Amino acid sequence: MIARRAFSVAVYARRGARVLVIEHRRLATWLPIGGELEAGETPLEAAARELREETGMAGEFRVLAGALDGVPPGLIGYEEHQAGSKGLHMNFVFVARVADDVDVTPNDEFGAWRWVTRRELDDLASPLNVRQFGYLALDADWA
């Protein structure tokens, strides 16, 4: 049995044919926006909060084409992995549409950010699942 579990979200902010990735200071890799759920928060609420807190942007989380009843708007996937002292890390992955005229407000959690295309995702120095979910975010079709 796993002693501890951590629930988190990842958010791919999408602007047309590009998604936002950040260079995470502590982990030294390119990732989507994200963080852990706070007490009483749903994954969707956490996704909206993390996007706002880490970038200053509001996202539009819409129901995706083909989504089943009860699936939160913008949910593109789920993954889990062992995360050291945090135990099992359970991560809900979302895509949110963001406005073209609003840019990222820098944050102390990341050193740099980029809006990347599918081709740029191919060469991104990041874990494979980050690129795979990035492709899903770019392919997401709003209902």
Model-derived features: positions:
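Nudix hydrolase/Nudix homology domain
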Residues: 25-30, 91, 95-143
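A short beta-loop-beta micro-motif enriched in histidine and acidic residues
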Residues: 7-8, 45, 89, 108-110
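Active-site segment of metal-dependent pyrophosphate-handling enzymes
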Residues: 56-101
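Short, charged/polar surface micro-motifs in flexible loops or helix N-caps
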Residues: 14-19, 27-28, 38, 68-73, ...
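Conserved N-terminal beta-strand and adjoining loop/helix that marks the start
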Residues: 1-19, 36-39, 93
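The catalytic Nudix box helix
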Residues: 32-68
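Conserved active-site beta-strand element of glycosyltransferases/polysaccharide synthases
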Residues: 22
